[in-house]
Amino acid sequence: MMLRTTASRKIVLRRGLASINTGTTVASKKASHKFRNTLWTIALSATAFYAGGIIYSQKNDKFGDFFSNNVPFAEDLLETYEHYHDRPTLFLEDSWDGLKAKSNDLLSGLTGSSQTRRSNRENIEVKKILSLEPLNIETENSDPQLKEIIGSLNDLINSLNDSNLSIPESEFNSIKKSNQNMLTNLSQLNETLKEALSNYMIQRTSEVITELNTQYENSKREFEKNLQKNLLQEVDEFKENLTKQKDKELEEKLKANEELLQAKHANEVGLLSITQVKEFNKIIKDKIEKERNGRLAHLEEINSEVNDLSKSIDRSSKILSKNEALVQLTFQVDEIKSRINNNNLPDVNIDKELSRLKLLSNLLSTFNKKSCCDDGDCCSCKKGNKNEGKEGKISCKCKPKTNPPSLLSVALDELESTCSGKKILSNEQIYNRWNLLADDFKTASLLPPNSGILGQLTAKVFSLFLFTKTGNPSNATDFDSVYARVGDNLRVSNLNDAVEEVVSLKGWPHKVCESWIEDARRKLEVQRLVEILDCEIRTL
């Protein structure tokens, strides 16, 4: 409809301006224009067809594709319509430029032909003076370019009115009609532009509002999310702190209540136990008093016999325990003797056996403990004693007697001090060590009493030329004879004589043999102490 109205308006305006520019008048009767009317009908029909096709194509895409593919010039018209429909101000700019150019041509034509009209004024039939009404269109909220177009047209109309042109009545009516049509078309265009602008503003406003609402919702959602996260974090921290504080307070209160209840329960249990003990004692006392005159008349005699029996059992138990301790002591001593005399063991450590002997000795000493009184019985066992209290208990006031240490404990102490943390060599190991001292013994036999480094070297060199004496030793006191006698004694396990021979040495030979003397003496001392323990245990 917009294209049709615009095209009609342009045609009418051209006709009116063309008749005005020529200045000719028609006095004869208006001829019929059948061919022109036919062309107008065809043009209007084609315009209506294309306009309807374009409008329906905007509403239906399938019809639009069919219309643009099968109707000539339809695709170009659709592109032009979409071009001006998206930017309606372009059409106003083009229309305004066309009108402005035509107005300039009209004014130039009027000016150029004014003299011709004056010369031919007598031959023209003047019917009416041209007087057009200005375009009274409300342009308060209209497009600025449309305002400019309406203002230019009003200036053109005022110029035509001021020129006082006389035209025939038919042309006057045609121009009047064209003016009315132009007013109507401009009013429609103004309303269309207002509506389009209003729709555009409403659409843009709705889009902006939608976009702002979306941004607001996103910001609101993000803010709510962050706020919720912060609040949850603060609530969790507050909850955790409050839980810890309350748990601590509850634990302290529970602990205090538990202590209070325990103390209260202990007091109640103590009071109840005291009451029960009193009641029990009272019941027992009553029953004893009742039974004492009946079946328990001989209770004291039975009690004395039971005491005698328990004493006999205690004495028997002590005797049995003592015998068992003696057996174990004998076994441990025999074990030590067998380990010391075993030549298959190069060295022996008897710390475990000593600890067992020590334990058995302490146990045996408890069985041999005497009473504190001279007659062998403790005063606490005597009846009718003056120290007897109300409850029948007797406090012994005898001075305690200190028993002298036994030979067994003394021997064990000596054995412990001799062998504690040290190893005892076998006879074969002692003999082998003595053979290892042969070279050093020969070197020491050649050294003077106060030898230096030179004397040491000289003795070492000359000792290489000495021979070790073996065989049946003589009673001589030279070093070779002593070495031979010691070796012979060790070979027959006569360790005592061998140690005496080595101890009798003096000077460097004695100093060379100090370590060997220490090991041999330890072996002799252990043997003697073990023999003492064996004899003492057999006498117990």
Curated annotation (Swiss-Prot):
GO-annotated biological processes: cristae formation; protein import into mitochondrial intermembrane space
GO cellular component: MICOS complex; mitochondrial crista; mitochondrial crista junction; mitochondrial inner membrane; mitochondrion
Coiled coil: 173-268
Knockout or disruption consequences: Increases frequency of mitochondrial genome loss and leads to altered mitochondrial morphology. Moderately reduces mitochondrial membrane potential and import efficiency of preproteins that are transported into or across the inner membrane via TIM23 complex. Impairs precursor protein import via the MIA pathway. 60-70% of mitochondria exhibit an increased inner membrane surface and stacks of lamellar cristae disconnected from the inner boundary membrane.
Pfam families per UniProt: Mitofilin
Mitochondrial intermembrane compartment segments: 58-540
The UniProt record lists the keyword Transmembrane: yes
Miscellaneous information on this protein: Present with 5730 molecules/cell in log phase SD medium.
Name of the featured protein: MICOS complex subunit MIC60
Annotated organism of origin: Saccharomyces cerevisiae (strain ATCC 204508 / S288c)
